[in-house]
Amino acid sequence: MAEVKVYYDRAGNTLTVWFGNPQDECICEETGDEVVLMKDKSGRVIGFEKLNFLATSSQPMRVAFEAVDVGKP
């Protein structure tokens, strides 16, 4: 099973999600919507970072993950 890593930086107000190996990061591309895409050397997106992300509570953040079957045409 693939691994997804989620990091929240309270000091930097960023939420970072990796679904590839962070060590494979070669280039970052800002989308203009306060989102930075992290890509490997082949240009494949392996993660993203949401800038100016503020948690609304001091409680630990819960992360829900759900697999969705989009079906085949």
Locate each region found by the language model:
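Small, basic N-terminal interaction modules of short regulatory proteins
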Residues: 1-73
